[in-house]
């Protein structure tokens, strides 16, 4: 805002996520909401990563619809080398990869895993990532008695992420609210099918992904 005032140049705000994505309504930090509102109100244009985020900007923050546009995220499919990985497990691998936080819905993934394992034992579940709910999720898995089929990798980066996708048979993104969600596109790079939340921006463009209410 100060740069706009100083230079007289137009201000464009790129909204990757909002406070309403990161927390439930009763947990939203109103101080952050005020800052987000101030920034978007001062902007000449607001770029949202999805129609979902665009609607939040308009309906929750009162931003003029005429200045909010949706521009979806993307990944570069060119130049990605195919990873050859050795699988040391014979079971199918179902993966959650992301921050282990309220927004990402990790406990829905755990509950789904428990239900699947009651019907089918030929599958392993992997939760790749770290976050403030990690220890809670580890205890949850132990309480459900599925620790022998459920694995926690911790935080992954770079080639570790691509290797994890290459080892996976299915990727699951059970987010409660996901402004876009780039990981299903990354899974597509290794030909891994995805089950994604309907409450996500990428659901607007991934017509062949299985979409679920979490």
Stretches found by the model and what they are:
Residues 176:
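Aromatic "clamp/platform" in nucleotide-sugar-dependent glycosyltransferases that forms part
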Residues 193-196:
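Short hydrophobic beta-strand element within catalytic cores of glycosyltransferases
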Residues 47, 88-113, 126:
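Conserved donor-binding/catalytic core segment of Leloir-type glycosyltransferases
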């Amino acid at each position: 805002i100060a740069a706009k005032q100083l230079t007289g140049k137009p201000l464009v705000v790129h909204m990757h996520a909002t406070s309403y994505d990161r927390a439930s309504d009763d947990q939203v930090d109103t101080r952050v909401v005020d800052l987000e509102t101030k920034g978007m109100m001062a902007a000449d244009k607001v770029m949202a990563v999805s129609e979902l985020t665009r609607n939040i900007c308009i309906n929750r923050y009162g931003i003029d619809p005429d200045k909010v546009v949706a521009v979806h995220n993307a990944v570069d499919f060119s130049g990605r080398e195919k990873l050859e990985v050795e699988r040391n497990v014979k079971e199918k691998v179902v993966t959650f990869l992301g921050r282990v936080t309220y927004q990402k819905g990790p406990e829905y993934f755990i509950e789904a895993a428990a239900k699947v394992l009651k019907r089918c034992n030929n599958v392993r579940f992997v939760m790749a990532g770290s976050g403030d709910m990690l220890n809670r999720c580890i205890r949850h898995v132990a309480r459900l008695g599925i620790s022998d089929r459920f694995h926690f990798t911790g935080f992954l980066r770079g080639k570790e992420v691509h290797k994890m996708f290459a080892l996976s048979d299915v990727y699951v993104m059970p987010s409660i609210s996901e402004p876009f969600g780039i990981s299903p596109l990354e899974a597509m790079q290794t030909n891994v099918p995805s089950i994604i939340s309907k409450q996500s921006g990428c659901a607007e463009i991934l017509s062949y992904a299985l979409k679920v209410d979490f």
